[in-house]
Amino acid sequence: MRGDAERFWGLRPQRRLDWRDVDEQHCVVLRPRLGEGRLGRWLARHLSDPYYRIKLDTIGSFVWRACDGETSLSVIAERMRRHFGDSIEPVEERLGRFVQTMERGRLIRGLGDTDS
């Protein structure tokens, strides 16, 4: 069990979708309306707005920007703790749930099939 937790916190999630900064604290993830396949991309060219916009709050935007494929979850958690202070606790639980939700939603990759 301990090995699974260590492995989980050593993972380096990576963003799968395009995104835009709204301001210094917020960003928006751009999810294709018609999927990521060739047909979806072709059809999307004929839409005035081919994306769903997923607006992230301050904490979600902080995590999203850190999911660069190079930064481990343990480093992200420590940066969150330094940036947000006690208001973010329990940081490991919150971060773990959030990145798992993002992976299930196919927003990020790199968590594999971990259950932690």
Q: Where in this protein do the model-derived segments appear?
A:
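Long, charge-rich, low-complexity alpha-helical segments
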Residues: 1-11, 44-116
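Hydrophobic packing positions characteristic
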Residues: 1-36
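Alpha-helical membrane-targeting segments
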Residues: 28-29, 33-53
